[in-house]
Amino acid sequence: MSHRADEIRKRLEKRRKQLSGSKRFSTQTVSEKQKPPSWVMVTDQEKHGTLPVYEDNMPTFNGKHPLVKTDSIILKCLLSACLVLVSAIAYKTNIGPVSQIKPAVAKTFETEFQFASASHWFETKFGNPLAFLAPEHKNKEQQIEVGKDLIAPASGKVQQDFQDNGEGIKVETSSDKIDSVKEGYVVEVSKDSQTGLTVKVQHADNTYSIYGELKDVDVALYDFVDKGKKLGSIKLDDHNKGVYYFAMKDGDKFIDPIQVISFE
């Protein structure tokens, strides 16, 4: 009987040792799993179970964006408003010094911006113009044509000379298509009391070509047109003959088109 009791006691002791070893291994495994890798930098605060405190070193701008100078923008807006106000007063009054500003303001607003010259300068200095200035179909061969001999809007016979009015000529032609004599920008499409439906093109050398007595136009304001580009058409009679008006300006001065273009 005592022998059997000793055997049971030994089995219980052996079982207790096995359970004790299993718990020790389990605790060690969990501890190793919780331990961070050796390459992770652990601060003293994290070792003691507290979260690290980070200081915000970003500079403050008191609610103002560092790249936007509000004061400067407001000042420019005020100056612009004052300029517009002075211009309006100059047109509405005839008092002393203020009225003297009127001619200068009028000349400024009447002077057309040199789109063609600006584009040509930009192209010379920096290469091809910006996308919204350059025509999609323009290539290097067409760029070289700037400054070459002018072409006639439409070949024909001159009916009215430059000396008749000191501004332009009238040409009789059998072609209903009117082309641009040189590349440039359309700066005016209007209906004139003397020349009817008229297109005005500005060129890079500060010259202008004017095409009148058109039946319809194929271009719009500020369009770029190449040399030889169709601007519009004229009406032909029963004998397939039509007349168009043409003039050229160098700055503010009219020049005789016959001196620079052959129409026959």
Swiss-Prot record:
SUPFAM superfamilies: Duplicated hybrid motif. It comes from Bacillus subtilis (strain 168). Residues 1-10 have a biased composition (Basic and acidic residues). The chain crosses the membrane at residues 73-90. GO terms for molecular function: metalloendopeptidase activity. Its main location: membrane. One of its GO terms (cellular component) is membrane. Forms a complex with BofA and SpoIVFB localized in the mother-cell membrane surrounding the forespore. May be degraded by FtsH. It is stabilized by an ftsH disruption mutant, and in a probably independent fashion, by overexpression of BofA. Residues 91-264 are forespore intermembrane space. Residues 1-37 are annotated as: Disordered. Residues 19-31 have a biased composition (Polar residues). It comes from the Bacteria. InterPro entries: Dup_hybrid_motif, Peptidase_M23. This is Stage IV sporulation protein FA. Keywords: Membrane, Sporulation, Transmembrane, Transmembrane helix. The lineage of its organism: Bacteria, Bacillati, Bacillota, Bacilli, Bacillales. It is found in: Forespore outer membrane. Disulfide bonds: none annotated. Implicated in the coupling of mother cell to forespore gene expression. Required for spore formation at 37 degrees Celsius, but not at 30 degrees Celsius. SpoIVFA plays a central role in both maintaining the SpoIVFA/BofA/SpoIVFB complex and anchoring it to the outer forespore membrane. SpoIVFA brings BofA into close proximity to SpoIVFB, allowing BofA to inhibit SpoIVFB. Increased accumulation of SpoIVFA seems to inhibit the activity of SpoIVFB and thus regulates the activation of sigma-K. One of its GO terms (biological process) is sporulation resulting in formation of a cellular spore. Residues 1-72 are mother cell cytoplasmic.
